[in-house]
């Protein structure tokens, strides 16, 4: 009686210091993919225009599906097994042919990736574009994927020209650009290796897809040199454009007050920067050397796929 209760030690020592705030970085919002569907639509419109210009009924009585398609009907199977136009029409509209490129028509290095040899050729490429391109655009945005598509297509066209010793091969198609997207997927996996969970599974699956697609290029009348050139261009460009922040990085604008900045992680790892600048140097050197060889009318004599085109 008359005794005061003991003072709790926490009152004497004051309130405990506030715990370091714990938070999760905001989940990135995926991009809305509109460029890939636009490219797909452009390819279909270009093919329809090609068939209209081709006008098979004006030159042949054996046009395929004339009753249904009329002027847009296909050349006879003996001329084009892919259900498409004639070679002169493709040449007229911008197909890649080294002889014409050397005569000053450099625009064919780009225009050829929007043309296709036939409806079957078009559908195969567009299905691949939807499967590969949509996911990449949702993750990395239209600017980087658009640059990848065009530059890879240009790289494929350049290698195709350089491996054509006769200068008379006519080449069309978006395959070089599509292989560039595959190459970029591989380099993206390598440079962002630390953020993947099932690393080996993802790598082996991607390599299997790439090998299967490259093996198709050894079939007759397939320009595998364009596939190879596009793949290389996309592979090196992927190191430049498709870097992801390392796990645990948070943009400074999302960091709450009171957070210990000593624990803040850098956006990219050192090896990512090394890959980026090395790949950019290789890419620029390759394009400059290739274009210089083309202007000087040189050919690449030691490519393993030259005889399969």
UniProtKB/Swiss-Prot annotation:
Its main location: membrane. It is a multi-pass membrane protein. One of its GO terms (biological process) is proteolysis. Keywords: Hydrolase, Membrane, Protease, Serine protease, Transmembrane, Transmembrane helix. It is found in: Membrane. The chain crosses the membrane at residues 27-47, 113-133, 140-160, 170-190, 200-220, 222-242, 274-294. The active site is at residues 175, 227. It comes from the Eukaryota. Belongs to the peptidase S54 family. Probable rhomboid-type serine protease that catalyzes intramembrane proteolysis. May function in reproductive organs maturation. This is RHOMBOID-like protein 5. The lineage of its organism: Eukaryota, Viridiplantae, Streptophyta, Embryophyta, Tracheophyta. The gene is RBL5.
């Amino acid at each position: 009686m008359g005794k005061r209760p003991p003072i709790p030690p926490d009152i004497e020592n004051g309130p405990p210091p506030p715990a370091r705030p714990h938070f999760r970085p905001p989940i990135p919002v995926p991009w809305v993919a509109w460029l890939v569907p636009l490219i797909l639509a452009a390819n279909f419109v270009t093919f329809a225009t090609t068939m209209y210009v081709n006008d098979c009924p004006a030159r042949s009585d054996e046009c395929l599906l004339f009753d249904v398609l009329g002027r847009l009907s296909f050349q006879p199977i003996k001329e084009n097994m892919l259900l498409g136009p004639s070679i002169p029409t493709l040449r007229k509209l911008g197909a890649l042919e080294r002889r014409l490129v050397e005569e000053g028509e450099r625009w064919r290095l780009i225009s050829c990736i929007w043309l296709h040899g036939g409806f079957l050729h078009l559908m195969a490429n567009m299905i691949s574009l939807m499967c590969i391109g949509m996911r990449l655009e949702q993750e990395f945005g239209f600017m980087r994927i658009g640059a990848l598509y065009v530059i890879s297509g240009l790289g494929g066209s350049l290698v195709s020209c350089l491996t054509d010793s006769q200068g008379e091969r006519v080449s069309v198609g978006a395959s070089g650009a599509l292989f560039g997207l595959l190459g970029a997927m591989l380099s993206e996996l390598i440079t962002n290796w630390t953020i993947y969970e099932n690393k080996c599974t993802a790598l082996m699956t991607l390599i299997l897809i790439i090998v299967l697609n490259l093996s198709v290029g050894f079939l007759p009348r397939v320009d595998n040199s364009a596939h190879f050139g596009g793949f290389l261009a996309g592979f090196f460009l992927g190191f430049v454009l498709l870097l992801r922040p390392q796990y645990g990085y948070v943009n400074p604008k999302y960091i709450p007050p009171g957070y210990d900045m000593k624990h803040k992680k850098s956006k990219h790892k050192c090896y990512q920067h090394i890959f980026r600048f090395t790949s950019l140097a290789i890419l620029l050197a390759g394009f400059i050397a290739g274009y210089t060889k083309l202007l000087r009318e040189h050919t690449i004599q030691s490519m393993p796929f030259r005889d399969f085109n």
